[in-house]
Amino acid sequence: MKTLVSLIRSENFEQEVIAEKRPVLVLCMPRDEEFPKQVEVIEVIARKYSTELKVGLLQEDFIEAFKKNYSVVGTPTFLILVEGKERGRMLGLADQEMLTDLISHV
C-alpha cells in the first residue's frame, strides 16, 4: 500500500509545509523502539484526513534543526502547522483518538 505520509527534509520543507494550503501534522521523533507504532498511527490519520490534512514525518537528519526552529524540547512531538506557523502541539506517544482530538482543535 502506498503511504500518504510525506518525508520532510530540509530541502523540501518549503514545498511540503510552508507552501501547503492544508494544515500539516508533523511527527518529530527519533527512530527508537516506539517509532514503528507511531508511524502506524500517523498512517491511519493520513488516510482518514487525506483531503483536509497533510501528514509528514521528519527525516532523521532534519530533526535537530526542526526542534530548534520550533522550540521542541521532547520527543515524540506532534505539531500542526499552517503555512509554517504552529497551530497545535502534543508531546508524548499518541494514539489515533489523541491525534484526532488535536486535529479537531485546528
Regions found by a protein language model. Name each.
Residues 24-26, 55, 78:
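Hydrophobic beta-strand anchors of alpha/beta hydrolase catalytic cores
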Residues 1-24, 101-106:
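N-terminal leader/targeting and pre-domain segments
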Residues 6-9, 28-30, 43-65:
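Thiol-based oxidoreductase modules, predominantly thioredoxin-like and allied folds used
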Residues 39-42, 70-73, 93-95:
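Short, glycine/charged-enriched secondary-structure capping and boundary segments
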Residues 12-47:
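Local sequence-structure signature of Cys/Sec-based thiol-disulfide redox active-site neighborhoods
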Residues 22, 70-82, 97:
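Structural micro-motif
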Residues 79-106:
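Non-catalytic, surface beta->alpha helical segment in thiol-disulfide oxidoreductase systems
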Residues 33, 37, 62, 97:
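Short alpha-helical
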